[in-house]
Design a protein with these regions (language model features):
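Short S/T/G/P-rich N-terminal loop/turn motif that feeds into the first structured element of a domain
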Residues: 1-53, 60-71, 82-129
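A short, acidic, amphipathic alpha-helical segment used as a generic capping/interface helix at domain edges
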Residues: 73-77
Length: 129
């Protein structure tokens, strides 16, 4: 399977945990940048109230997402110290059966899930600043 794999997740932040979330997110970004050389983009966004956090990941392929899940296991184990619940998860691009099985472990009732496996058209620029 070729083509980009994009993952978008939105979480609520526990009351009183915004500063911890900011600190831990900064640490996570540094870790990902250092340890995941294939990751094309990794961005975290807060809403204006500081009550929701959205994570946007752009991978060159699904294998990069599989690697991301493996190397970030420690972060995932402690993320809900400051995050309350996941509101949605979105996946764009083809994924392997192994990745689909791994991601299904995180599925929860009531969470909005979007999977769009067919990359119809597009391009990626990596040299534009």
């Amino acid at each position: 399977m070729t083509g980009p794999f994009i993952a978008v997740f939105t979480y609520t932040i526990k009351p009183g945990k915004l500063e911890e979330a900011r600190k831990r997110c900064g640490e996570l970004v540094d870790f990902v940048e250092t340890n995941e050389p294939r990751m094309i983009a990794f961005h975290l966004f807060l809403d204006e109230e500081g009550s929701k956090l959205t994570v946007v990941q752009v991978h060159p392929d699904a294998a990069s997402m599989e690697f991301h899940l493996q190397v970030n296991a420690k972060h995932f184990a402690t993320a809900f110290d400051y995050l309350d619940k996941q509101l949605n998860e979105q996946y764009y691009g083809p994924m392997s059966e192994a990745l689909a099985a791994e991601l299904s472990k995180w599925d929860e009732p009531g969470r909005k899930l979007i999977r769009m496996p067919v990359h119809e058209a597009g391009f990626t620029r990596t040299n534009v600043r």
